Amino acid sequence: MNTATSTAYSYKVVRQFAIMTVVWGIVGMGLGVFIAAQLAWPFLNFDLPWTSFGRLRPLHTNAVIFAFGGCALFATSYYSVQRTCQTTLFAPKLAAFTFWGWQLVILLAAISLPLGFTSSKEYAELEWPIDILITIVWVAYAVVFFGTLAKRKVKHIYVGNWFFGAFILTVAILHVVNNLEIPVTAMKSYSLYAGATDAMVQWWYGHNAVGFFLTAGFLGIMYYFVPKQAERPVYSYRLSIVHFWALITVYIWAGPHHLHYTALPDWAQSLGMVMSLILLAPSWGGMINGMMTLSGAWHKLRSDPILRFLVVSLAFYGMSTFEGPMMAIKTVNALSHYTDWTIGHVHAGALGWVAMVSIGALYHLVPKVFGREQMHSIGLINTHFWLATIGTVLYIASMWVNGIAQGLMWRAINDDGTLTYSFVESLEASHPGFVVRMIGGAIFFAGMLVMAYNTWRTVQAAKPAEYDAAAQIA
């Protein structure tokens, strides 16, 4: 028995995280559709504090970023680090702890946020006891990941692991520094920082939660699963190394662009803007590297919907990372800030890049860890692809139109200097966009239900003996 386990990959924790990625994806995106409907039809708030938009919106963001995105990152990093190091996970019991610990974090978030327990910091709303639990789980994750790298059977550390490693270390630093707080009761604390300093620390964290959790981590996924699915080596390995160092050097500086025209010192705003513009180069370097990996394999897109998911995610990544630096320019930001354009930009990255690359990776990974040849139905993957693409496009386009309309209406003034439009008029103009956004989100959500069915049928058909056979190290 011991011999078998020592020569078999630790796939159990990968299977658990993969299944929970789909589950939390449905929960988080279902919540997203519901709060989108609340904006279109406010009576859906039901006049209850627990179901109000203000409490459910942070629950939605935490569910899709940390529950769906987090589980996807755990599953794919645990899978690819074993494969690229040709060794089993370091401390499999600790890896099991990261699974149960992370699910507990998600559960506590799902209970505390609707009850109104919040630090009020975006993407870091969870109160201090949960912050401590996150830190403990994250340290365990780092030990497992870097421990596995340390006992690798190959000399080289694959580039995907560099991205996963940077994501794990940076998120740890961001989480600890931004959540330094003084507890006053069991579920209430106050930030250690005040005023503009607090805002700066918050958006250094907030932007780099995007930069490292939702970008570097998912680039780790891209660098493993795109070459695997295309059956081609990375287009330029040298470019991938340059991409890595350039990205992690520049990204950490870009946070102030969230605070243009605020009390933040002007030099800090300008620095954030310049760094955001520089960021275009490494971002597009990575996107081009991923796309060009398909050189000689473009024909596969006709018959392989999994590869289509991965390639379209790269296209959305390219689009989002062009749009982000553009929106960081102060003159553009004067129009876009506080409007739905920002929401559209975020979802170009969240639905188009993060969700699509995760879905593509899961469709590749699930059959591998459950000992199946492929997913239950390739046709259903194709259906999911079109639902996801159409849903994303509707979502983004409606928010672009809304955002630019809002920005123009808010700044329009009459000859005597009074505002041309009242806020309510801009809200009325936004209503059709709210409805289209909800429809786009619902279409994307329908795709997740298709994925859940396909995954369930694939898992149901697998036998425990097949799991073991699939986990054997060749």
Swiss-Prot record:
Regions that span the bilayer: 17-37, 61-81, 97-117, 130-150, 157-177, 206-226, 239-259, 271-291, 309-329, 346-366, 385-405, 433-453
Source lineage: Bacteria, Pseudomonadati, Pseudomonadota, Gammaproteobacteria, Pseudomonadales
Function: Cbb3-type cytochrome c oxidase is the component of the respiratory chain that catalyzes the reduction of oxygen to water. Subunits CcoN and CcoO form the functional core of the enzyme complex. Subunits CcoP and CcoQ may optionally bind to the core. CcoN is the catalytic subunit of the enzyme. Electrons originating in cytochrome c or a quinol are transferred to the bimetallic center formed by a high-spin heme and copper B. The complex also functions as a proton pump.
Membrane side Periplasmic: residue ranges: 38-60, 118-129, 178-205, 260-270, 330-345, 406-432
Keyword tags: Cell inner membrane, Cell membrane, Copper, Electron transport, Heme, Iron, Membrane, Metal-binding, Respiratory chain, Translocase, Transmembrane, Transmembrane helix, Transport
Gene Ontology CC: one annotated term: cytochrome complex
Gene name as annotated: ccoN1
Co-factor binding details: Binds 1 copper ion per subunit, denoted as copper B.
Catalyses which reaction(s): 4 Fe(II)-[cytochrome c] + O2 + 8 H(+)(in) = 4 Fe(III)-[cytochrome c] + 2 H2O + 4 H(+)(out)
InterPro entries named among the record's database cross-references: Cyt_c_oxase-like_su1_dom, Cyt_c_oxase-like_su1_sf, Cyt_C_Oxase_1, Cyt_c_Oxase_su1_BS, Cyt_c_oxidase_cbb3_su1
Family, per entry: Belongs to the heme-copper respiratory oxidase family.
Subcellular location: Cell inner membrane
Subcellular location, principal: membrane
Organism the protein comes from: Stutzerimonas stutzeri (Pseudomonas stutzeri)
SUPFAM superfamilies per the UniProt record, alphabetical: Cytochrome c oxidase subunit I-like
Summary of subunit composition and partner proteins: Component of the cbb3-type cytochrome c oxidase at least composed of CcoN, CcoO, CcoQ and CcoP.
Positions bound to heme b 2; high-spin: 345
GO biological process, one term: proton transmembrane transport
PROSITE patterns assigned: COX1, COX1_CUB
Record protein name field: Cbb3-type cytochrome c oxidase subunit CcoN1
Membrane topology qualifier: Multi-pass membrane protein
